Swiss-Prot record:
Similarity annotation: Belongs to the bacterial ribosomal protein bL9 family.
GO biological process: translation
Cellular component, GO annotation: ribonucleoprotein complex; ribosome
Organism this protein belongs to: Nostoc punctiforme (strain ATCC 29133 / PCC 73102)
Secretion signal span: none
Protein name from the UniProt record: Large ribosomal subunit protein bL9
InterPro entries: Ribosomal_bL9 (IPR000244), Ribosomal_bL9/RNase_H1_N (IPR009027), Ribosomal_bL9_bac/chp (IPR020594), Ribosomal_bL9_C (IPR020069), Ribosomal_bL9_C_sf (IPR036791), Ribosomal_bL9_N (IPR020070), Ribosomal_bL9_N_sf (IPR036935)
Described function: Binds to the 23S rRNA.
Domain of life per record: Bacteria
HAMAP family: Ribosomal_bL9 (MF_00503)
Keywords (A to Z) from UniProt: Ribonucleoprotein, Ribosomal protein, RNA-binding, rRNA-binding
GO MF terms, alphabetically ordered: rRNA binding; structural constituent of ribosome
Amino acid sequence: MAKRVQLVLNQDISKLGKSGDLVEVAPGYARNYLIPQKLATNATPGILKQVERRREQERQRQLELRQQALEQKESLEKVGSLTIAKQVGENEAIFGTITTQDVADAIKAATGQEVDRRGITIPDINHLGTYQAEIKLYSDVAAQVDIQVVAS
């Protein structure tokens, strides 16, 4: 079996790994492609310590983000229900629909917190009534909020 060299990736490379990963590759692949293109660095003890330090910092940052998401979830669920007023036509049908941006604006008005509209999941809202919205705050943290649609 041919000798393999250990490298630390500087960038994400499909089929090989993510930035900061320790990988073993053929010496020619490392010497002719990865190192000249600055996609990887030789895995020296100093570089390995640096990578481990970066991983620990990233782990701490992710823990802090998750904790903030949990606190935000708690405050969102304390609000209870959000009220959104829309113009109404026949049969209590609203003009237009309620969008995720409308929900994000209602959350900001009620709590003062910014919520990314891309993390909000709502059903199609075309009539007056009460609906449930799910707000994804972190990969495993989501808040449930009631939306009350009323006539303006």
